[in-house]
Amino acid sequence: MSLAFTLLTSKDNTDEDEEHLELSSFNQEKLLEMISVFLSRLTRLNDSKQEATESDQIPLSPTSLKNPCLIFSAKNVPSISIQAYLTRILKYCPATNDVFLSVLIYLDRIVHHFHFTVFINSFNIHRFLIAGFTAASKFFSDVFYTNSRYAKVGGIPLHELNHLELSFFVFNDFNLFISLEDLQAYGDLLLSWYRQNGQNYNPTDVSCSIESPISHTPQQNQQDEQPRRPIMDRRLLSSHSIG
């Protein structure tokens, strides 16, 4: 059962006092913590599922544009926690709340696009995050940084980020548009879930070993046409979500 369905139909979330996340003013560090808690619990769940069903398999190197699990998988689980990774991204590549929240929605779309055969796990979550953030920053922001900066902040080679970003676009059907209503719905849902499930979370604050990036001048983004409006499924990483 999807997280969104669980929350929307539970008695605790049908009261008149509904949770509301103010996108423009919500504390960014708190938002990153909420996203991190959800993704950390999701990846642990999927890790255990894969260990039970694929105990004899190991992550493979990127070899195919058809399988995001292969393309985004690292050889080893990164030593930096999800929350520390997102905090690092925010520090060196500042962005608004809608950019970070949109990455969660894009991951949901990818999972749904591949008919729930994609596992968001500890081997691929960091690469999904940096690729999604790179794409979302260019779509939502008037200014953005070069891919060389995003790659350095993310701790991966530039050529690999370029490949991951293109794959991220492909897996989202080159459609990154998200309506304000859908952003708000996901934000409210995430806040509600966190207040019920995330209070006992203690993240492992592991610092990243790569050196701090140097300053780069942001590039202005020029959009000539309006993107088409997608049909939103409104499920948070539905295939393996946790309630």
From Swiss-Prot:
GO terms for molecular function: cyclin-dependent protein serine/threonine kinase regulator activity; protein kinase binding. It comes from the Eukaryota. Residues 211-231 are annotated as: Disordered. Residues 211-224 have a biased composition (Polar residues). The keyword Cell membrane does not apply. It holds the Pfam family Cyclin. One of its GO terms (cellular component) is cytosol. Its main location: cytoplasm. Gene3D superfamilies: Cyclin-like (1.10.472.10). It is found in: Cytoplasm; Nucleus. The keyword Membrane does not apply. GO terms for biological process: negative regulation of sister chromatid cohesion; regulation of cell cycle phase transition; signaling. Keywords: Cyclin, Cytoplasm, Nucleus. Forms a cyclin-CDK complex with pef1. Belongs to the cyclin family. PHO80 subfamily. Cyclin partner of the cyclin-dependent kinase (CDK) pef1 (PHO85 homolog). This is PHO85 cyclin-like protein psl1. It comes from Schizosaccharomyces pombe (strain 972 / ATCC 24843) (Fission yeast).
